[in-house]
C-alpha cells in the first residue's frame, strides 16, 4: 500500500484552531493538563484494581458467581486505567510534570501491553493518518469488526453493535499476546516503520512482559 503524503498546509486553520483552544483555557483559568479530579480518579482506579486482584487471587470466593462478577469488574478497571490514566499520560496531558506523565503511561506496560508501541501506533500513526484503512492500526479489527467503509463487509458485521464489547475484550488479549510482538520484531506498525528502540525501551518491553506473565498468568 502507498503511504499517504500530506502537503504543507497553506491556510491558517490549524494555527487559528490551536490559538482559540489555548485562549479558551487561559480565559477560563483552566489547565490543559489534569487536575485534582483526574489524580483522584487515577488513585481510585489503581487502588481498586490492586485490591480486586488481591481478593481474586488470594481470597477467592467460594461462590462462582461472585468470582465472575469480580472478573468483569476487573476487566472494566483495566479499561478504566487504560482510558483515564495511561492515555492521558502517554499523550503528555496527565500532568505538567514529565515524570508523572511517564509513570501514568507506564501503567499500560503493567497491564500487559507496551507504551512505546502504543505511542508509535496511536500518537504518531493514528493522529497522522486518522481512520485511513491499511495505515491506521487503531481501526484494524478485521475481520471481526468493520470500523471503516473501505474495509471488506461480511454478513456478521450487521450484528457487530451487539457483540463489539466481547470482540474488543478478545482484541485486547490479541494485542498483548501477539500484535505487540509482531510490531517489535518487524519494527513497524502496518506499513509504517517505528522509531529505533533504545536499550531502555527493549528492557522495558521484555521486563514488563515477563512481569505481566508472572503476575497474571502464573500466579
Task: Walk through the language-model features, giving the residues of each.
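Short, charged cytosolic
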Residues: 1-23, 170-186
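Short intracellular "coupling" helices and adjacent cytoplasmic loop segments at the cytosolic face
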Residues: 2-11, 29-32, 112-115
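Generic amphipathic alpha-helical segments used as scaffolds and interaction surfaces in large
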Residues: 4-12, 60, 153, 198-202
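Juxtamembrane membrane-interface segments of multi-pass membrane proteins
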Residues: 11-24, 118, 122-130
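Membrane-interface, cytosolic juxtamembrane amphipathic helix immediately N-terminal to a transmembrane helix
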Residues: 18, 22-39
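Alpha-helical bilayer-embedded segments of polytopic membrane proteins, i.e.
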Residues: 32-82, 109-110, 161-173, 196-219
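Membrane-embedded catalytic scaffold of the fatty acid hydroxylase/desaturase
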Residues: 73-197
